[in-house]
Design a protein with these regions (language model features):
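Glycine/threonine-rich beta-strand-loop-alpha-helix active-site module
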Residues: 98-124
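A short core secondary-structure module
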Residues: 117-155
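Gly/Ser-rich catalytic/binding loops embedded in alpha/beta enzyme cores
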Residues: 1-99, 117
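Short, flexible helix/strand-to-coil boundary loops that buttress conserved ligand/catalytic motifs
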Residues: 49, 106, 150
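Short, amphipathic alpha-helical segments
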Residues: 19-23, 75, 105-108, 140-143
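Short, solvent-exposed loop/turn segments at the edges of secondary structure
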Residues: 56, 60, 78-79, 106-109, ...
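Mature extracellular/periplasmic domains of secretome proteins
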Residues: 85-86, 108-111, 153
Length: 155
């Protein structure tokens, strides 16, 4: 999101980074009338950089926690989105999947995650990890919530 919100991928290396425009999927959500509340924490660089850090950890945001059990790993790099929906903080969220980053938080937070086929949703404006695997998906507390959000962003 471009609204004077830093885009750091959870890393101090991008401290102060402001983007000139919304990611295409964010623009599509706005055009569909969605009220966007902000950004959620994620694993640094949307990936596990070392085995000594758990999923959901970033230098900027610390360790994301499961809303059901603070000692459990919330799963995947999109853990903040999954945990936020699981905690009923918001009805839907976006997540990017390269290798389990939508599926794992959905499973661990008892929510619905839609991981689309690569290319079905735009990655324009998303910090890339893998051109052949990255895809933007949705989370919802219910299937209806996840599908409504997905319907707004697919191309």
């Amino acid at each position: 999101m471009k609204d004077k919100t830093q885009t750091t991928a959870g890393s101090w290396a991008l401290q102060g980074s402001l983007v000139p425009r919304d990611a295409f999927v964010v623009t599509k959500l706005r055009d569909a009338g969605a009220l966007l509340l902000g950004k959620a924490t994620l694993s640094e660089w949307a990936d596990m950089r070392t085995n000594s850090y758990s999923e959901g950890y970033s230098g900027r945001g610390g360790q994301c926690r499961s809303p059901y059990n603070l000692t459990l790993n919330p799963g995947g790099s999109s853990s903040g989105s999954g945990s936020g929906v699981g905690a009923n903080a918001f009805s839907f969220a976006l997540g990017t999947e390269t290798d389990g980053s939508v599926i794992s938080p959905a499973e661990r937070n008892a929510i619905v995650g839609i991981k689309p086929t690569v290319g079905l949703t735009s990655r324009a404006g998303v910090i890339p990890e893998s051109a052949h695997q990255d895809t933007v998906g949705t989370f919802g507390k219910t299937l209806r919530d996840a599908v409504y959000a997905f319907d707004a962003i697919w191309e």
